[in-house]
């Protein structure tokens, strides 16, 4: 039962149109990307920087360095595949979540709310990561390029096809699936748990502001918990590229990752660069991920509200 502060379309028992959810998810993806594109570039540059290199030090300094060496537009490198990825990812994530949520509620009516949210969120994350992965990899490759020459999406695709084949578009997908599955499950679980707690204490003075911040809280928790795996994913996405000389002064670092398992790569990073390497870029990651998650969830819910209002208006005499 949803007695809360506002309708929650992600709640167990809520019957949501899969079609409407896909549209709302696409819209949320566009808004989320528009707000955070430059931060994404800075975050990924941090994650890809080996410990031997000390080029990018602080957020402001990194932005100045990128603009000085590559121009202002460099902060939007990879924006075309990234925007497409956010649209596809948002559509599949929320669409599959609604579908799994409806099916799970019908098949397992006694399943707990939090248990269902965690399970359905994981399934939605796994599905969306597989569908959108080639776009995610393209985004990382384009952002990693430090030269002033702007590689086009078509050129990058052609180089990947010639040098790596079809498999090149899915390099590191198992790690990505782990990252996104965990992140999505934690995000939806945190979001729903915060809203449930607020509904159970709706008369308390803090319930409304905390409920309004549920998307921010969900983004913070999910990103912090999976960031080390996300760093591993980024490094694996560029390790087979023939352009690694354009990504760092120490391309041999990435070459050493080739033909190794994700476990072996993490061990190598820990041994050569320390634990801090897995968290490099976390501050910018939170600056980007927290508003991204909050905007995505907010826009999705408000778009679904518009669909609800439209249906009620259509039924009115």
UniProtKB/Swiss-Prot annotation:
Free-text function comment from the UniProt entry: Mitochondrial transporter that mediates uptake of thiamine pyrophosphate (ThPP) into mitochondria.
Positions of Solcar repeats: 16-103, 112-197, 206-306
Family statement: Belongs to the mitochondrial carrier (TC 2.A.29) family.
GO terms classed as biological process: transmembrane transport
InterPro entries: Mit_carrier (IPR002067), Mitochondrial_sb/sol_carrier (IPR018108), Mt_carrier_dom_sf (IPR023395)
Protein name, as recorded: Mitochondrial thiamine pyrophosphate carrier 1
Subcellular location: Mitochondrion inner membrane
Keywords linked to the UniProt accession: Membrane, Mitochondrion, Mitochondrion inner membrane, Repeat, Transmembrane, Transmembrane helix, Transport
Bilayer-spanning residue ranges: 15-37, 80-100, 118-138, 168-190, 205-227, 281-300
Gene3D superfamilies: Mitochondrial carrier domain
Organism: Kluyveromyces lactis (strain ATCC 8585 / CBS 2359 / DSM 70799 / NBRC 1267 / NRRL Y-1140 / WM37)
Record membrane topology: Multi-pass membrane protein
Domain of life: Eukaryota
SUPFAM superfamilies, per the entry: Mitochondrial carrier (SSF103506)
Keyword Transmembrane helix: yes
Family annotation (PANTHER family): SOLUTE CARRIER FAMILY 25
GO CC annotation, single: mitochondrial inner membrane
């Amino acid at each position: 039962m949803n007695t809360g502060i506002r309708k929650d379309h992600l709640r167990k028992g809520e019957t949501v149109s899969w079609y409407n959810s896909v549209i709302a998810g696409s819209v949320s993806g566009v808004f989320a990307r528009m707000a955070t594109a430059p931060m994404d570039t800075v975050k990924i540059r941090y994650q890809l920087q080996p410990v031997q290199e000390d080029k990018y030090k602080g957020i402001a300094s990194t932005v100045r360095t990128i603009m000085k060496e590559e121009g202002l537009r460099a902060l939007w490198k990879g924006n075309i595949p990234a925007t497409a990825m956010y649209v596809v990812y948002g559509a599949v994530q929320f669409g599959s979540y609604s579908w799994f949520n409806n099916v799970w509620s019908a098949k397992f009516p006694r399943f707990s709310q939090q248990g269902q949210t965690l399970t359905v969120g994981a399934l939605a994350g796994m599905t969306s990561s597989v569908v959108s992965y080639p776009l995610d990899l393209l985004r990382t490759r384009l952002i990693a390029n430090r030269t002033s020459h702007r590689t086009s999406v078509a050129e990058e695709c052609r180089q990947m096809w010639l040098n790596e084949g079809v498999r090149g578009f899915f390099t590191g997908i198992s790690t990505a699936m782990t990252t996104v599955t965990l992140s999505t499950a934690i995000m939806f679980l945190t979001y729903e748990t915060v809203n449930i707690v607020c509904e159970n204490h709706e008369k308390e003075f803090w319930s409304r502001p905390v409920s309004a911040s549920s998307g921010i809280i969900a983004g913070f928790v999910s990103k912090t918990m999976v960031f080390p795996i996300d760093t591993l994913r980024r490094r694996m996405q560029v390790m087979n590229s023939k352009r690694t000389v354009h990504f760092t002064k120490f391309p041999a670092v990435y070459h050493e990752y080739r033909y190794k398992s994700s476990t072996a790569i993490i061990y190598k990073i820990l041994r050569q660069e320390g634990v801090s390497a897995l968290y490099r870029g976390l501050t910018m990651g939170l600056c980007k991920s927290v508003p991204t998650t909050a905007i995505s969830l907010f826009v999705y819910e408000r778009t679904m509200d518009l669909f609800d209002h439209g249906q009620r208006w259509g039924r009115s005499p």
